[in-house]
Amino acid sequence: MSSGGRGSAWRDRNVEHFVRSIVKAALSLLVLQAPSTRAQELDHIAVFLEFCTGTRIAEKIVLTAYHCLENRIPKSASGSGVKVKVTDHLISPLAREMKIDVRHDVALLYLEKSLPAEVPIVPLASRGQKFERYVRLGYGFHAGENGWIDSNALGKLKVDEVFFWDKRPSEKGKMRFAQPANRTCPGDSGGPTLGLDNGHWYVAGVTSRVLPDLRHRFSWIVPLIQGKELPDYARYCGEFYTAERVTENLDFLVKGVQTLIARHPEPLLRAAPPRKVTARRRK
């Protein structure tokens, strides 16, 4: 091979290596540097998943809770009035059921096609980011004033500002929020708890479980002793809810997006055939 040929091959390999490194870096930052979501877009952010809720974090990828996929994978995701088929999923390898909650309660769904542009791609919170306020979105059941589910209807969006249950919330582990006016109930699982930073929303948490306080946790003892029918606590929305902290799952979320994109490569666009140009006679 001539020196010119060797030089050309060397340049080609370097160009290929450079392109691959750029693509890899872009994929790694895809989730973290999604376009900011302005405050007025709240009504379009949450994605309905038949029996849970989710958030669009990449072009065809929806973030939800691991426990939403334990028994059955959602068949479709709906946003802005459009239903799209779910074709693949990934569960955090660290996810596991605990006594009263789920650890690393996150999973990803891959859609057959993109949701409408009205459903924004929401960026994930970054480590150390501080928020002015929090809002929880969910398509779950609705509860009455006493906290018990009073309707079996799912699919009606709830948008509520939420506040920490703890007076001094921890910087690590699950976030615990007091119940808002429209209580967090089953069906809200997997939905986002959004944090507001400088006029833009970020996914700070993923709704995990609704839990009762100690008083309600042991309230079944009295009716048990009295021989009365026990309350159906599966229909109770609890005093607070937990949200999986996004910043403790960034490694899985970034690599998970990369994996799903690699599994489903986009077909190359074919060049449109040249149109026939016909000459028109002037009148």
What is the role of each PLM region?
Residues 35-39:
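Sec/Tat signal peptide C-region and signal peptidase I cleavage site
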Residues 20-28:
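Sec-dependent signal peptide recognition
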Residues 52-53, 190-192:
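Beta-propeller and closely related beta-sheet repeat lectin domains
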Residues 103-106, 110-183, 207-223, 246-250, ...:
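Chymotrypsin/trypsin-fold serine protease catalytic domain
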Residues 40-78, 90, 94-97:
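Catalytic histidine site
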